[in-house]
């Protein structure tokens, strides 16, 4: 199995997992502002972000659409991220409209978060938001996944590939990411809710 330098060194030290916890702090003013923005929601709040800056981390848009259609009856779904986020019906779109800190403040009011390995994954962890993270296989969950999260990944022979830039292309059609089903994400969220 291919390993990156962190995994290699962890194995040499006899460590199976490095448990890191992020921290993110909001001011009282930021918290109050976000509370006013989210008080209108009458169902549990599910925050989503569908895109990372790296294409190899982006779960297919049609999967997101199916996921949203399955969840919008029971959740107020808020969409965070930047202006490149796709537009979906049945979500409260904040994507592309907020600063990073405003997005974090809104996220702090969410009950759950679903998204890719991205900045918002780290912020959600720092805010103690229960999360389902769709990793695929381009990165190692052992290196970047938080143990509190439900980290969904596949590990075909080519993974982790560590492809970062748009110049590098996946020769396997991102099967590690595309093989994570909507049902798997739904079930993972339901398991979080039961905890």
Language-model segment annotations:
Residues 1-195:
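Catalytic machinery of carbohydrate-active enzymes
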């Amino acid at each position: 199995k291919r390993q990156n330098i962190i995994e290699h060194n962890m194995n040499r030290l006899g460590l199976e997992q490095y448990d890191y916890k992020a921290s993110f702090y909001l001011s009282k003013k930021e918290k109050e502002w976000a509370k006013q923005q989210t008080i209108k929601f009458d169902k549990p709040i599910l925050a989503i972000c569908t895109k990372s800056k790296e294409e190899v981390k982006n779960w297919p848009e049609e999967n997101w659409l199916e996921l949203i259609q399955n969840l919008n009856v029971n959740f107020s779904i808020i969409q965070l991220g930047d202006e490149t986020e796709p537009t979906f019906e049945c979500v409260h779109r904040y994507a592309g409209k907020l600063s990073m800190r405003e997005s974090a403040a809104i996220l702090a009011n969410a009950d759950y978060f679903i998204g890719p390995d991205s900045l918002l994954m780290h912020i959600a962890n720092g805010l103690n938001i229960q999360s389902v993270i769709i990793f695929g296989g381009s990165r190692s969950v052992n290196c970047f996944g938080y143990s509190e999260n439900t980290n969904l990944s596949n590990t075909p022979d080519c993974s982790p590939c560590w492809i970062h830039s748009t110049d590098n292309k996946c020769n396997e059609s991102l099967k590690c990411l595309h093989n994570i089903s909507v049902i798997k994400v739904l079930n993972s969220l339901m398991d979080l809710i039961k905890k």
